[in-house]
Every structure is written in C-alpha cells, then in structure tokens.
C-alpha cells in the first residue's frame, strides 16, 4: 500500500518582473507557518528564494526555488524563478510542471508585456488553472484604479482562453503580510484568501492507473548505494522492486527500482505528480542520461519521426522575425531532452510565417521516447520559436 498522503498539487508564481512574485512566495510560506501546523510549513525568506539554486533543464541553466507548504487538506510544491528568461524556459521545458499558477500583477502597473507572455505560455504548456494575486494594493488608494486593473487582467485571461470572469482575483500586499507579527492581521488574511482560492482548484487528475513513466532530469551516483535518477513522475506508480526500462537516445536497458526518495525521505512508492529520485540496480552513472525515460516494461518506444501540429511564435512573442522553409533544422525540446530535427512542410506550402499554425513532419537526429499527444517546444539560437503537439508517430 502507498501510505495515505494529502493530495499534492504543483503551483508556481508567474507574472512580470518586479511585480512581487518572490515576495509573495516568501509571504505564503511565512503566513502559513504562523497560522497552520504541518511539517511542510516552514517560513522561507526572500533572499533564500532570490538566490535560488541553479537547475539544468533541457541543457539550459535555470534558477528555480522549490518551496513546500501545506493546508489541512493539501500539500503544495511551489516553484519560483527569479529571472524572467528563466520562467519562459521553465514553462516550456516543463521544469516547473505547474498544475496551477498564481499570476502576480502589481496594482500600480497593471498588465505588462511579461504578464501577457506568461499567460500565453501557461495556456500553451497546459496549465489548467490560474488564480490572480493583485499585489502592492497597499500603495493604491483609488478603488476605481484597482477595479480597472482587475478588469484588464480578467479580459487578458479571457483573451488567452481562461475563464477570466470566474477566476479568483485576490487584492493584497505581500510586503505588508510579511511585516505583520502574528499572521492574523488584515494583510495576512489576504494571503489566506489566496490559499482558499488555491484550495478551490480541482485536484489534477493524476494518471496513477496508467503504466509508470518518468522523464529523467538528472543522474547522480551515491557511494555505496548506486545510481539515482531524478525527475517528475508523469504517470503511474513505481514501487521498490518493480522492473523498469530505460528508453530513448540509446538501446533499451532493463533494470529494477531499488529505492524511491522524495524531499530526502525514503518511500515505498512514488506516484504520478511526484518529484522523486529512483535508485536503479546495476546501472552505472554513465549508462543513463538526462532526456531518457524510465518506463514500465514494453510501454514506450523511441522514435525519430512524427507528425505534429505546431504554432510558430510571432516576432512580438519573442519568436522569429522571418519565415522558414522546408528542411529548417531547429532544436526540439521533448520532455527533458533537446534534439536537432529536420522540418518537412506539407505539399504546396512554400514557407511558414511567424504567427502561423501548421502541420509538419519532423525527423530527429536521435531516437527519443515519445507518444501521441506529447507537447514539445521548438528552439533556435537560445530562444523559443514555436511550440507543438505530436499528432502521429511515423517510425
């Protein structure tokens, strides 16, 4: 039996630079630590988050701070990235696999370019739910101004396909909440209001009943214990003693899971949605690499060719300024790996303009573990130029 745990949800703060994402992250942990007991609730200071450890996601260095907190009903893992470029990379690479996002908007500025960009990205990478934290409300006396900013955000969310009229918008001040001694002041109540909005979000359907699959983010060698791979379990359950395969980039290898760890605790099992470390029997560190997947035996194969529906970003969205033609060769970011591939355009299509939606055929340089419905990003020269979804596997 997997031990009974509180339902787990992955959230992240998104929004424009300097609107207060990191301050809010600090305020959430601090107010909850004062208000609620729970081993997950420890207050984390702003500069601990701001000097976030660097992670490698798809070969790109990203600073991400992971904090955890819990309410009576749920356990939250929360990711905050101090840098703007880090957010973009993080959302596309899935390093911040968010079930829900807290969109932070400063009441003094309203929606800004990155606000739009982050909402668009959240939609493209499949973040289902958003709640809004209107920050810095302590410095705006004008009620009408606050209402205008709120209306603007709701319209923006609707424009990108979120239910803008129904989304919770909480007006608060993260700085003021941090200053309050007890955790029960007027601004701390606003933090609790935000938590209540998060509590209302329907729990993501974790694909626990499907065969186990986890994309490998990192590989470590632990003296005396062997090789550990880390990543987020995409679907299924892994128990100590289960047979598993390592698929993609190389020949398939078979091994056995000899340990599961999460937040430095040993567990009997890990399940969909968990960020876990898996100990592998008889596998050396050099036998396995980031970008491969761990899978229940026989469930996934690696392929080089597929068809996909892609959206090519406009220049204003940070995409290409010029069209591309058949045989264009960008990088494809699939799960935790990036591989060069060749794009073949459909019959009769000469070129693709920024802003186009198109069906393409892709031939990758190396075989990667993929399946239908999988999302990926297309990048070139350090920037994202498109995103897509696999519609058909060819070989």
UniProtKB/Swiss-Prot annotation:
The keyword Nucleus does not apply. Residues 80-83 are annotated as: G3. Residues 135-138 are annotated as: G4. It comes from the Bacteria. GO terms for cellular component: cytosol. GO terms for molecular function: GTP binding; GTPase activity; guanosine tetraphosphate binding; translation elongation factor activity. Residues 6-206 form the tr-type G domain. Residues 173-175 are annotated as: G5. CDD domains: EF_Tu, EFTU_II, EFTU_III. Gene3D superfamilies: P-loop containing nucleotide triphosphate hydrolases (3.40.50.300), Translation factors (2.40.30.10). Pfam families: GTP_EFTU, GTP_EFTU_D2, GTP_EFTU_D3. It catalyses: GTP + H2O = GDP + phosphate + H(+). It is found in: Cytoplasm. HAMAP family: EF_Tu_B. Belongs to the TRAFAC class translation factor GTPase superfamily. Classic translation factor GTPase family. EF-Tu/EF-1A subfamily. Monomer. GTP hydrolase that promotes the GTP-dependent binding of aminoacyl-tRNA to the A-site of ribosomes during protein biosynthesis. This is Elongation factor Tu. It comes from Ehrlichia canis (strain Jake).
């Amino acid at each position: 039996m997997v031990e009974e745990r509180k339902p787990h949800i992955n959230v992240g703060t998104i929004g424009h630079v300097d609107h207060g994402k990191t301050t809010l992250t600090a305020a959430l942990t601090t107010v909850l630590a004062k208000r609620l007991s729970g081993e997950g609730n420890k207050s984390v200071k702003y500069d601990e988050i701001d000097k976030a450890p660097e992670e490698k996601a798809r070969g790109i260095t990203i600073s991400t701070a992971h904090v955890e907190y819990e309410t009576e009903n749920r356990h939250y893992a929360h990711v905050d990235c101090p840098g703007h470029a880090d957010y973009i990379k993080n959302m596309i690479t899935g390093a911040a696999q968010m079930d829900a996002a807290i969109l932070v908007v400063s009441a003094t500025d309203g929606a800004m370019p990155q606000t739009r960009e982050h909402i668009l990205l959240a939609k493209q990478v499949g973040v289902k739910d958003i709640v809004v934290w209107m920050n810095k409300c302590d410095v705006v006396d004008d009620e009408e101004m606050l209402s205008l900013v709120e209306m603007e955000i709701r319209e923006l969310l609707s424009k990108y396909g979120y239910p803008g009229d129904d989304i919770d918008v909480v007006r608060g001040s993260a700085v003021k909440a941090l200053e309050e001694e007890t955790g029960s002041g007027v601004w701390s109540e606003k933090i609790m209001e935000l938590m209540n909005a998060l509590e209302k979000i329907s729990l993501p359907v974790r694909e626990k009943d499907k065969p186990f699959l986890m994309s490998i983010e990192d590989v470590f060698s632990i003296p005396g214990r062997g090789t550990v791979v880390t990543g987020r379990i995409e679907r299924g359950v892994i128990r100590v003693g289960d047979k598993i395969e390592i698929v993609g980039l190389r020949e398939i290898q078979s091994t056995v899971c000899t340990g599961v760890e999460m937040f430095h605790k040993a567990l009997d099992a890990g399940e969909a949605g968990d960020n876990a470390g898996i100990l592998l029997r008889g596998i050396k560190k050099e036998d396995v690499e980031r970008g491969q997947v761990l899978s229940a035996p026989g469930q996934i194969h690696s392929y080089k060719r597929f068809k996909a529906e892609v959206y090519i970003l406009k220049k204003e969205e940070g995409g290409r300024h010029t069209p591309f033609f058949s045989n264009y060769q960008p990088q494809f970011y699939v799960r935790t790996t990036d591989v060069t591939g060749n794009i073949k355009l459909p019959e009769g299509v000469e070129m693709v303009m920024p802003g186009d939606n198109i069906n393409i055929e892709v031939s990758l340089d190396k075989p990667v573990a993929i399946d239908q419905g999988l999302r990926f990003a297309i990048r070139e020269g350090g920037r994202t130029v498109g995103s897509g979804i696999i519609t058909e596997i060819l070989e």
